């Protein structure tokens, strides 16, 4: 009997030997089976490396060779570190899936892996490894419209972006992880799994939180638990949700169209996060401004429609305010993309009530007035440049964001760059028509279902909006004088 049989347990060796002794030709069958299994495992490892956009033998990318990783087609319960079951993903897939941290073996040690898992067969659809180095930004954010409603404040967004260097395969989607969390539904699941005590609601006086937009102590402890579990797996999860027990995060502005929030340990009057409704071309979304913290540099983001944008503030060269009307304005930033090429990005139909929040952020990072450089002089009428600039500054500086709840009201901006494919876009396939699994909880059904229906209605209107915006763009340019512009750029 050859050495190949030695890889099996003793009992199985005896059974194989008994079969081979009765029929010598069966030995080749066993050898063929072993060769087939080894080939399949090798293909799986290559597929994992390709799916992650990594070189198969890249020690720099993952700390050691991916040849030594042997992921299972299903996740064994004993390997699960932490799991949020059946949550609504918006990206990179669009269905209810499990968000699972689990272990796979590498060099005899457990390696943490973040997987998007199909609950129907417990099989990972997408997996991310080397989390400590791969994750660029991981956030929990309020949802505009939910943050003002005490009944919906617990439905929030978790999003996670990977570093561009993590993807070496240009065919691999760079879409971030974006999913909705229903904290009240998760509370029930955590009680059922004994991660929270069954009498947790009796341990706190929740009376004052029922009509409040601040997280109640139970919701805050769920977020704290998530933060600690993510940290255990090498991911720094930062929460921008209002809370007043474990951490002190406070709303400075909380409207249906914008929020601004200060975080624990920082100046309570200075926002650590600003999020406002805007458009990029014909697509609506959120402009998000993040101050530097202990884990991340300052960022400017556009989310949550595809393609999302993520830029460190150090990559922003200048900012211009244009298309100023009574109610709205546009912000155009010049950035350096990953190829160190300058790129212009316009965010339009921003409620002018939030101009000061945005301008304060721009100014605080050394992006100051540069209206009169040679490039921008062409955009203004020379004889009226000073008058226009002063008038725009005066008009936009008179409204305080805390006293307005008006929605953005204006025409669409220039959509020329909306269809461009750019290396710095977190872009991928925009096939969002996959089926959504059944609701797993009645609480999630009543709250999350409402949000999903609204989102589907928005998507059905998107083609009409794009066509309307294309027609309105010409009107907008005729409507606004060329003099209505001023620009900000980096201080020398």
Curated annotation (Swiss-Prot):
Where's it found, cell-wise? Nucleus; Chromosome
Assembly notes: Interacts with histones H3 and H4.
Name one cellular component (GO) term: nucleus
Q: Which organism is it from?
A: Lodderomyces elongisporus (strain ATCC 11503 / CBS 2605 / JCM 1781 / NBRC 1676 / NRRL YB-4239) (Yeast)
- Annotated Basic and acidic residues bias: 472-492
* Family under the similarity heading: Belongs to the RTT106 family.
**Which regions are flagged for Acidic residues bias?**
412-471
Query: Which GO MF terms are attached to this record?
Result: DNA binding; histone binding; nucleosome binding
SUPFAM superfamilies recorded: PH domain-like
Function (record text): Histones H3 and H4 chaperone involved in the nucleosome formation and heterochromatin silencing. Required for the deposition of H3K56ac-carrying H3-H4 complex onto newly-replicated DNA. Plays a role in the transcriptional regulation of the cell-cycle dependent histone genes by creating a repressive structure at the core histone gene promoter.
* UniProt keyword Transferase, yes or no: no
From the Swiss-Prot or TrEMBL record, give the protein name.
Answer: Histone chaperone RTT106
Q: Which UniProt keywords apply?
A: Chaperone, Chromosome, DNA-binding, Nucleus, Transcription, Transcription regulation
Cite a single Pfam family from the UniProt record: PH_18
The principal location of this protein is: nucleus
Residue segments, region Disordered? 392-492
Ranges of biased composition (kind: Polar residues) = 396-408
- SMART domains found in the cross-reference section: Rtt106
Question: At the top level of its lineage, which domain of life is listed?
Answer: Eukaryota
- Keyword Nucleus tagged: yes
